């Protein structure tokens, strides 16, 4: 067990002077977490000069439609080249998602028959 290091630190995010963890909705907390992940992506890209792979598991869960659509646009933006995200059901993906969509059926990965 390690007793010191960045993994032992707490990060406090505030919104309008209040701690988001204490007052934020589930969607706001999820949005903050995704925002940190996108900032990490930009930092890694800048530091390495290469495009990192972005892995997001069930990222649209607990986000309202507006937040889903804004994130969808951000993920399809120029410069974001390698994004892998999962969703348990196809209807949980926002309409117009500008990414290639694949599905796993019978243990095989294949392009989705119907675009989102």
Named regions from a protein language model:
Residues 1-55, 62-66, 70-82, 91-100, ...:
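Conserved NTPase motor "head" modules and their coupling/switch loops across ABC/AAA+ ATPases, GTPases
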Residues 87-89:
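Conserved H-loop
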């Amino acid at each position: 067990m390690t007793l010191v290091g960045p993994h032992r630190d707490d990060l406090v995010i505030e919104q309008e002077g209040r701690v988001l963890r204490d007052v934020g909705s589930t969607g706001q907390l999820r949005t903050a977490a995704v925002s940190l992940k996108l900032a990490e992506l930009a930092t890694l890209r800048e530091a390495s000069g290469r495009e990192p792979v972005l892995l997001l598991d069930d990222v649209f869960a607990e986000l309202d439609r507006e937040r889903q659509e804004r994130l969808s646009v951000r993920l399809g933006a120029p410069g974001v080249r390698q994004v892998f995200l999962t969703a348990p059901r196809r209807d949980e993906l926002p309409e117009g998602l500008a990414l290639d969509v694949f599905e796993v059926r019978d243990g095989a990965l294949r392009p989705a028959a119907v675009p989102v």
